[in-house]
Amino acid sequence: MGKYAFRRLLQLIPILFAITFLSYGMMRIAGSDVVTQKMENTGQILSEDKLNAAREQLGLDKPFLTQYFVWLGKLLHGDMGNSYVSSLPVFDTFISKLPATLLLTVTSILLTIIISIPLGILSAVKQNTITDYLIRLCSFIGNSLPNFFVSLLLMYFLAIRLRIFPVISKDVSLKSVAMPAITLAIAMSAKYLRQVRATVLDELSKDYVAGAKARGVKFSVTLWKSIMKASLVTIITLLMLSVGNLLGGTAIVESIFLWDGVGKMAVDAISMRDYPIIQAYVMWMAIIYVVVNLLTDLSYRFLDPRIRLGGVKQ
């Protein structure tokens, strides 16, 4: 286990190196350096000589690889440059958005677990009954509705009509995060309860369930001690992937509710061509998915002892 984790961590080094190279190259391909962008933002008109002098002062006249390694050295010391728009350090700007994103992620995941797992189990246990059909219908509707439409519905009924929650998220609090979290939880629950149902149905068809029933073991005991334990690998995989998506920010939902998280920050940066912020966001997304995949692989060994971390199942 320890050797596998160490080997995977070593494999992350070239991946992260490639991510930094591609994200830095992306900014160069964009065709607008810090001097040009600041000039556009401030409305200044500089002569070509002054532009070249400013680029030389910032080292932008040097070869691409030289600029990259200088930037990489600063990055390793926590210096990601300054925003083109606010002139604030990118690292500080990014860190200031993380609490909102973390709160939205945790709240959405908890709501998804509370909704999808019980309903998925109930749908499987009550297969081909009215209960099963109603749950599957709700899942179909939830999958069909886009997030922006659900956001507007919740905003109209819960905020404008019933006035339970604020229309706009003014701070990072549970009351403000409620509607964005419910919106995301509806979409994820609609998708995941079908997966939970399919996994539980697969376990119900296996011989050990019939054997337990023949021995007089209560179904509730078999369900929670055997069936759910065998289904955990699928459930954990789905939840870990959702964590990756949510930590990367949910741009549409955050923008609608003005939730000041990473996703909204990325949308604002794209609209204002704030390339250092975009660059930091791209690296954050890539790192999150790499780390989440690693943690998912490591969790398999704890959830199912039959799985060997080399990819072979005993």
Give the role of each language-model region:
Residues 30, 142-145, 247:
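Transmembrane helix irregularities
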Residues 2, 94, 98-131, 171-314:
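Alpha-helical transmembrane segments of integral membrane proteins
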Residues 17-21, 106-110, 149-156, 283:
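Hydrophobic alpha-helical transmembrane segments of multi-pass integral membrane proteins
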Residues 21, 25, 29, 122, ...:
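Hydrophobic membrane-targeting alpha-helices
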Residues 136-198:
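Membrane-water interface segments at transmembrane-helix boundaries in multipass membrane proteins
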Residues 16-66, 163-179:
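Hydrophobic alpha-helical transmembrane segments of membrane transport/permease proteins
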Residues 60-117:
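An internal, D/E-rich "acidic patch" concept
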Residues 2-7, 11, 118-154:
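Cytoplasmic-entry segments and transmembrane alpha-helices of multi-pass inner-membrane transporters
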